[in-house]
Amino acid sequence: MDVLFVAILAVPLILGQEYEDGEELEEDEYYQVIYYYTITPSYDEFGVNFTVDYSMFESENTVNRLDEKVEASETTISYETDRADHQKPVIEKPVTMEPQSPDLNDAVSGLQSPGPLLLSWALIQGVMYFL
């Protein structure tokens, strides 16, 4: 890479010099030399390792399991005023919601109607006709 960089910088400087005896090169006599080197790394020294680290997937599964197993205790709410004996405490259970996965039918519903498909096909055919 360094050789290519030096060659690109040095060639115009060498070819663009003015001669002392008054002889100058014409513009059509100029030429530029560029050397291209391709460096291909050798992988013979290193063993290829296609090991997949499953720890990320395991931690994702743990997080998903924790989301589903939310344990909440019952909550007692009493609306106390001066005369608390006339009111009964209200017991509410907390609502636990499981994470919802996207429904596959929602993704496929756009494919069930042929309208957009026919419109895009007609548009492509029209463009190809005019080209």
From Swiss-Prot:
- Which keywords annotate this record? Glycoprotein, Secreted, Signal
Which source organism does the UniProt entry give? Bos taurus
Q: Which PANTHER family match?
A: CHROMOSOME 1 OPEN READING FRAME 54 (PTHR37870), CHROMOSOME 2 C1ORF54 HOMOLOG (PTHR37870:SF1)
Q: What is this protein called?
A: Uncharacterized protein C1orf54 homolog
Q: Which residues form the signal peptide?
A: 1-16
Report the domain of life of the source organism.
Eukaryota
Q: Which residues are glycosylated?
A: N49
Q: What is its main location?
A: secreted
Report the coiled-coil segments. none
Q: Where in the cell is it found?
A: Secreted
* Any one annotated GO CC term: extracellular region
